From Swiss-Prot:
Keywords: ATP-binding, Cytoplasm, Kinase, Nucleotide-binding, Transferase. It catalyses: CMP + ATP = CDP + ADP; dCMP + ATP = dCDP + ADP. The gene is cmk. This is Cytidylate kinase. GO terms for biological process: nucleobase-containing small molecule interconversion; pyrimidine nucleotide metabolic process.
Length: 225
């Protein structure tokens, strides 16, 4: 199995993309690239500098001045901002509730896509996000579009928040996730949408193991081609 392909996993907020993508990458010994973490890191950096996240020009100045890197830790992938581990702080509700605003800016997305394509150039990657199959890796050999109900996604995010010790309100999360869906699907630049050649996977009633099994079956088929 020497062939190394690119795998694009897209879907709305809290659909379980990152969790599944990490497992798939590990099973294949591929590199996992969390594009959402890149936007989160920029959001965190902008908030730290009190930058108005509606101001694209200011955001671009921040983006050009920062280095975002990934390192594979023992069990998880770590995200570094200018050499500092920000894996946990970019997952706080503060960042989560603002990242869609940062991600809607055209110039920001263009620069992020350039960086993401650079990271994926060698193949052997699993990349997840909102526009991977449609925009970042349009030629990916495997494209997955993960779906789940707002209720299910809010429940997952709620449990994740509780586990991390963040305060969490399930009803509030439902509203926030629905709002992020709206922002992500209606933005002018690379909106969230399923690529025509993507496999759609509704994960509402599936366990992580079942989702991974489904994806690995699709990958195995692609590797035979």
């Amino acid at each position: 199995m020497d062939k190394r392909i690119s795998i694009a996993i897209d879907g709305p907020a809290a659909a379980g993309k990152s969790t599944v993508a990490k497992v798939v990458a590990k099973q294949l010994s591929y590199v996992y690239i969390d594009t959402g973490a890149m936007y989160r890191t920029l959001t965190y950096a902008a908030l730290e500098q009190n930058i108005d996240i509606e101001n694209e020009e200011k955001l671009m100045e921040v983006l050009q001045s920062i280095r975002i890197e990934f390192q594979q830790g023992k069990d998880t992938q770590q995200v570094f901002l200018n050499g500092q581990d920000v894996s946990e702080v970019i997952r706080t509700p503060d960042v989560t509730n603002r990242v869609s605003i940062v991600a809607k800016h055209r110039l920001v997305r263009e620069e992020m896509v350039r960086r993401q394509q650079e990271l994926a150039a060698q193949g052997g990657v699993v990349m997840d996000g909102r526009d991977i199959g449609t925009h970042v890796l349009p030629n990916a050999e495997v494209k997955i579009f993960m779906l789940a109900s707002v209720e299910e996604r809010a429940e997952r995010r709620h449990l994740e928040n509780m586990r991390k010790g963040f305060s969490s309100n399930l009803e509030q999360l439902k509203k926030e996730i629905a709002q992020r869906d709206k922002l992500d699907s209606e933005r002018e630049v690379s909106p969230l949408k399923k690529a025509e050649d993507a496999f759609e996977l509704d994960t509402t009633s599936l366990s992580i193991e079942e989702v991974v099994r489904n994806i690995m079956a699709i990958v195995s088929e692609a590797l035979q081609k």
